[in-house]
Structures are given as C-alpha cells and as structure tokens.
C-alpha cells in the first residue's frame, strides 16, 4: 500500500503551490509583476503540473546538431531503422506481456475444486508460484510504495529525469540536423513524475520529407536505447572501474541487516561481515549468494555427518510427533538452541533425536545419506534437520566470526540482509558507495530501456504515433493513392496499439495494487 505520509506530502505540496499561484494571480498588487516573472523565467503552473522552458541551451543544441554532419546523418539513420523495428516489435512485446499477466491472474485465482486441497498440493502450488518468479515480465507497472521501495525513489526519479533529458536531446539534435527550427528546451514535473521536452517549429516539421521526420521522431527512443546499452557496459565494467578502491571475488560484504531480520543477534550477521559460504555453497559475489539461496530453498534440506559416539553423547530420550504440515518435531522444550534431527540407523530405520544444533553441525561435513559419511573405521550417520516444509537450517560462514546458524525461510534471509560484492581496500572508503552506483545504473538501464520500448508503441500521444504516420507516408504514399485509406490504416494500427498499451497498464496496476 502507498504510504499515507507520501500521499500527504504530495497532495499537500501541490495544494500549497496551486493556492499560492492562484492568490498571486488574483492579487491586485502582485498580479502583473508575478505574471511577468513567470513569463520571463519560462514558468507555467497548473494543477499538479509545473513546466519550465528556456532558450539558454539553444546555442549548445545548434552546435551539436551542426557538428560532424555526415556522422550524425549515419547516426540518425541507424536510429530510424531501430525506431521502425522497435515500433513493430512493441506489438509482440506488449502482447506477450499481456498474456503473461492474464496467465498470472488465472494462476492466482482460486479454483472452485481446490478448496479442500491437501497440504502436499498447497506445497506444490507454492513451489510453482515461487519458480514463476524466475520468469519475470520484461515490462512491469511501477507504483511507489508498493513494488518500488520508498527509500529508492531518489534513484527512480533521477533515472527518469536523465532518461527523459537524453530522449529529448536526441529529438533536438536530429531536428536541427534536418533544418527544423529549435525554439527551446524544458523540464516539467507532473505530480511526482519529472520529464523533459523540446519545442520545435511545427511548420518546418511538416514541410520536410517523411524520411526526415522519421529520423527526428525515432531519435528519442534511439538515444534511450543507446543510454541503456552504455549503462549495461558500465555495470559490467564496474569492478574494473572501482578496482583501485574496491576488490571483488572473495565473498559478499554485509551492508545492512534489517531490524526484523532473523539474522540479527549476538551470533548473527553484522554490517561489515564478509560471507564466504552458505552451507557448502561457495559465495564469491552477489550472484553466488542469490543462486546459493535459491538452491537451498528448492532442494531438500542438507544433512551433517556425525559420529555414532558423538550422537550418543549429545542425544537424549525424546518423544516425536507430527506437525500440521507432516514434518516431525522431537524437541519439546521450545529451546532456541536445540533442533530435531532425523537419521537412519544401521538397520535403515528412520529415527529422530533432539540435539544442540551448534554442537551437532559445527566442524562437520555435509551429506545426503549415510554413505557420504563413510570415513575411517568409526561409524557415522547423516543427520538431517527435521523442520517445517519451507524452513531450512543454513550454516553461514563469515570468518573470522563463528558460523551463524540460521533457521528459517531462505527468502527471509534474502530480503532482510543487504549485501555487496565490493570490498573496500581502505578503511576510510564507504561500503555503500558501490551499492549506490550499482543501484542507480540498474535503474537507469531499466527506465531508459522502458522509455524506448513504451515510446515506440504506435499509440496516441506517444512518439510511436508520429513514427507510424511518417512511416506510412514514406512507404504507402506511392502504393495507395487515396490518403483517406492510408489514414484509416494508420488509425486502426494506432487504436490497436493504444488498446494494447492501456490493457497492459490497467491489468498491471490491478495486479500490483489489488494483491
């Protein structure tokens, strides 16, 4: 749910701005001077919308647009080809996204025949829904406070603004390259959404050829696509860029542990700890951490080898009983240090025993069965923690501290512990800086790429509308002599694109906010 405080700040702030604007424009004393000030500074204010336009960047735009004319010609030709391909590809992408959303809605809807499903079927559906997370959609609706953390709004809006500015710079340079008069550049704020725009002389735009128009209209999404590619390159090269100050490949560094995290405590994880293993799974970077947790979550609980003499020494008589999910519990004292283990004796009979977890699993090798523990003459058993269905016992190695024994769902560890692959070489360096840079670049890649895809959709009021019109003018004018037929074809394509985009946005919003 969207935080109430965020809504109050947004609505209250806009109300104050609009009322101040209304009062000043209604004032006998300040009306003319205030309106002159707005006009001189290129400002305009309306409900939930502030717009600023200036001509101070015109010289820079004209300089960019007239420099290396031949190279720019080839550059925007590439952009034109990309824009046309992106326009038609957007239909396929939106159609696929819509089908994925509908399939997800059907999967989330309770079946009338499943009201009395067993615990095993419940476990199966939970597992399948979790695995579907790996098949994420390319396009997703983002709502601040719901699927966009409030503490990452700065990254989001900064990336949106930069993507918008780069988009409009593309339009502006292409327009000047095609001899269209450039009036100015501006920035706007709509509710909480920042953006940019360029003001072009419409008459000049209508007089140039359809191919020239295509170069201008495709330039924005082309620049967004290139920006996303540069972001990917920067992300890949980030370890090299930060190499003089940070090193990687030896583990993951803990940057934050949430207050409600199960990993918090005297023998838990602390900021600055270096994690090298999860169970027997080596961790050298963030990707390893995520893959290890996935493996632990979706595979059966791993066991630990223990000698028969140690098992006899640590265990004590217990009475085992079944939990509601079918698993077995045998520790009746509600101890935070004891865990119920199961194992098979020499006669292959399954037994249960309650053991102090740390003494049982410390300095032992992992196993799947008794065969994995056959070493030397002493008899050993593979003891497996008997836990609830989705709960795991995870041994987290973070030397030089003693291993942390985590009992809980692996996803809780994933969501409540923040990590980074970058370890500072010097104590004065911040452990958060690489995370900040990495997070911002990821937002820039996602949002610039999304802006390129969405703007390419042949939809009313988007770049795709003008790309489509210019494309039809360039290709169908000589084939279809009747302009009305050509306009009708364009209208139905635009209508289809608009409906497809609206359906994706509507269902996407419903999926995000209703669940």
UniProtKB/Swiss-Prot annotation:
The chain crosses the membrane at residues 4-24, 75-95, 96-107, 141-165, 170-182, 183-205, 225-247, 443-460, 461-472, 489-509. SUPFAM superfamilies: PDZ domain-like. GO terms for biological process: bone maturation; cholesterol metabolic process; membrane protein intracellular domain proteolysis; mitotic G2 DNA damage checkpoint signaling; positive regulation of cholesterol biosynthetic process; positive regulation of transcription by RNA polymerase II; protein maturation; response to endoplasmic reticulum stress. Signal peptide: none annotated. Residues 25-74, 108-140, 248-442, 473-488 are lumenal. Its cofactor is Zn(2+). It is found in: Membrane; Cytoplasm; Golgi apparatus membrane. One of its GO terms (molecular function) is transcription regulator activator activity. The keyword Glycoprotein applies. Binds 1 zinc ion per subunit. It is a multi-pass membrane protein. Glycans are attached at residue 333. It catalyses: Cleaves several transcription factors that are type-2 transmembrane proteins within membrane-spanning domains. Known substrates include sterol regulatory element-binding protein (SREBP) -1, SREBP-2 and forms of the transcriptional activator ATF6. SREBP-2 is cleaved at the site 477-DRSRILL-|-CVLTFLCLSFNPLTSLLQWGGA-505. The residues Asn-Pro, 11 residues distal to the site of cleavage in the membrane-spanning domain, are important for cleavage by S2P endopeptidase. Replacement of either of these residues does not prevent cleavage, but there is no cleavage if both of these residues are replaced. Zinc metalloprotease that mediates intramembrane proteolysis of proteins such as ATF6, ATF6B, SREBF1/SREBP1 and SREBF2/SREBP2. Catalyzes the second step in the proteolytic activation of the sterol regulatory element-binding proteins (SREBPs) SREBF1/SREBP1 and SREBF2/SREBP2: cleaves SREBPs within the first transmembrane segment, thereby releasing the N-terminal segment with a portion of the transmembrane segment attached. Mature N-terminal SREBP fragments shuttle to the nucleus and activate gene transcription. This is Membrane-bound transcription factor site-2 protease.
């Amino acid at each position: 749910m969207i935080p109430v405080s965020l809504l109050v700040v947004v609505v209250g702030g806009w109300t104050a701005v609009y009322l101040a604007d209304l009062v000043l424009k209604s004032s006998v004393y300040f009306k003319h001077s205030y309106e002159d000030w707005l006009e001189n500074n290129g400002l305009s204010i309306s409900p939930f919308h502030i717009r600023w336009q200036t001509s101070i960047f015109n010289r820079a735009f004209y300089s960019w647009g007239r420099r290396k004319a031949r190279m720019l010609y080839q550059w925007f030709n590439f952009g034109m080809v990309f824009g046309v391909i992106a326009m038609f590809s957007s239909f396929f992408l939106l159609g696929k996204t819509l089908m994925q959303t509908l399939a997800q809605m059907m999967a989330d809807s309770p079946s009338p025949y499943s009201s009395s499903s067993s615990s095993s079927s419940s476990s199966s559906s939970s597992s399948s829904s979790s695995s579907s997370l790996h098949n994420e959609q390319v396009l997703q609706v983002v709502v601040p406070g719901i699927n966009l953390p409030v503490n990452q709004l700065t990254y989001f809006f900064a990336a949106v603004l930069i993507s918008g500015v780069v988009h409009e710079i593309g339009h502006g340079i292409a327009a000047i390259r095609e001899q269209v008069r450039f009036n100015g550049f501006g920035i706007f704020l709509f509710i909480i959404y920042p953006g940019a725009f360029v003001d072009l002389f419409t008459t000049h735009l209508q007089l140039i050829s359809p191919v020239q128009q295509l170069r201008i209209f495709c330039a924005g999404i082309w620049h967004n696509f290139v920006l996303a590619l540069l972001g990917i390159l920067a992300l890949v090269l980030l370890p090299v860029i930060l190499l003089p100050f940070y090193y990687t490949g030896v583990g993951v560094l803990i940057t934050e542990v949430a207050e409600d995290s199960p990993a918090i405590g005297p023998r838990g994880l602390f900021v600055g700890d270096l994690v090298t293993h999860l169970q027997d799974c080596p961790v050298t970077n963030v990707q390893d951490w995520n893959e290890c947790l996935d493996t632990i979550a979706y595979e059966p609980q791993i066991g630990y080898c223990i000698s028969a003499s140690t098992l006899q020494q640590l265990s004590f008589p217990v009475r085992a009983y079944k939990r509601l999910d079918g698993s077995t519990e045998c520790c009746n004292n509600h101890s935070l240090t004891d865990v119920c283990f199961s194992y098979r004796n020499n006669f292959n009979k399954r037994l249960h025993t309650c053991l102090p977890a740390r003494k049982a699993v410390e300095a032992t090798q992992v196993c799947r069965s008794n065969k994995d523990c056959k070493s030397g003459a002493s008899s050993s058993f593979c003891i497996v923690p008997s836990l609830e269905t989705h709960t795991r016992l995870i041994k987290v190695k973070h030397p030089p501290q003693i291993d942390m024994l985590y009992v809980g769902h692996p996803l809780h560890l994933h969501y409540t512990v923040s990590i980074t692959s970058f370890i500072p070489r010097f104590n004065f360096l911040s452990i958060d800086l690489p995370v900040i840079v990495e997070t911002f670049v990821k937002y820039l890649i996602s949002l610039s790429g999304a802006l390129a895809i969405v703007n390419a959709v042949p939809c009313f009021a988007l770049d795709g509308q003008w790309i489509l019109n210019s494309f039809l003018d360039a290709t169908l004018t000589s084939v279809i002599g009747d302009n009305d037929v050509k306009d009708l074809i364009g209208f139905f394509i635009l209508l289809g694109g608009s409906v497809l985009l609206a359906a994706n946005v509507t269902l996407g919003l419903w999926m995000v906010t209703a669940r």
